[in-house]
Amino acid sequence: MTCFYGCFALGSLYWTLYLLLFSETPQVFYVSEFGWVSSVIFLHLLQYTLSSDGERRFLTGKALIAPLIGVPLCVFYCTFGDVLSNLLWCGMMIVVSYHSIRGLAYAQIQTGTACKMRYFHIGVLCYVAVEYVLWISGCLWPGYSISAPYCWLDLLLTGCLFALLPATGKAVQV
């Protein structure tokens, strides 16, 4: 979890400092993008580490919602921006949301401490959903003013990131 937060924070720090120092968004955004991509990779590793063998083997059709939503959104995002970056991001979000939906379905049939994983999976799904909506708002309503939907959704994303920590804490309590 620390690696997830650390990478996300470093990517955001670069972006914010560049914006404050030069009054424009970075022209070479791959520095911050590398941090953000790394954070999602660490989130997936955390998902894998927290899941049990039974959860990893659990199959449910509900998890197919992830690619059914993610693939059309990926096509939509690719019409507005860099194709490779959008394919990478959407692919990672599909994988993370697939595992969270599967984990949430598995946690619903568990009892005791195993069912506490649902808080973590709900937190991850909230993060993915807000990221998707944030990207949609960036495509449809560009701009960085305080009145832009992107600004408010970015604030909501920050709230989701903060909420993910106690959700993970509940998942790992013994």
Question: What are these regions, as identified by a protein language model?
Answer:
Residues 60-78, 152-155, 165, 171-174:
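Long hydrophobic alpha-helices with heptad-repeat/coiled-coil character
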Residues 69-106, 147-153:
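Extracellular-loop-to-transmembrane junctions of the mid-late helices
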